[in-house]
UniProtKB/Swiss-Prot annotation:
The lineage of its organism: Bacteria, Pseudomonadati, Pseudomonadota, Betaproteobacteria, Burkholderiales. It comes from Paracidovorax citrulli (strain AAC00-1). Heterotrimer of UreA (gamma), UreB (beta) and UreC (alpha) subunits. Three heterotrimers associate to form the active enzyme. GO terms for cellular component: urease complex. Belongs to the urease beta subunit family. The keyword Cytoplasm applies. It catalyses: urea + 2 H2O + H(+) = hydrogencarbonate + 2 NH4(+). SUPFAM superfamilies: Urease, beta-subunit. Coiled coil: none annotated. This is Urease subunit beta.
Length: 116
């Protein structure tokens, strides 16, 4: 063994086991590309991204840390989201939440605009 060497079993290894995930279809209705980073609260992304924001509350992209997904104008793609962990408190982003994610359900919690 070499110092720092990692010995990994064969096969696939989930990066984030035991956390809820959801798959959503997202469409960019803007005339410019929109890029979303790995740890951005997905429900608070650019308003030109069309998807179920209530379903995305408290979730981020299930991608490797430090990476991003780019949505070209008019592009529709399917993404997998994963629950935020830790204290599940969100500040910043677009300023829609500013506190605990679990203060209520997606339908009653303050912050996110409701879909028509």
């Amino acid at each position: 063994m070499v110092p720092g060497e990692l010995l990994v079993d064969d096969g696939e290894h989930p990066l984030i086991p035991c956390r809820r995930t959801v798959t959503l279809v997202v469409r960019n209705s803007a005339d410019r590309p929109i890029q979303v980073g790995s740890h951005y609260h997905f429900a608070e992304t650019n308003g030109a991204l069309d998807f179920d924001r209530a379903a995305a509350r408290g979730m981020r992209l299930n991608i490797t840390s430090g990476t991003a997904v780019r949505f070209e104008p008019g592009q529709q793609r399917t993404v997998e989201l994963v629950d935020f962990a830790g204290s599940r408190t969100v500040y910043g982003f677009r300023g829609d939440i500013q506190g605990p994610l679990d203060a209520g359900t997606a339908e009653t919690a303050p912050g996110l605009p409701q879909q028509p």
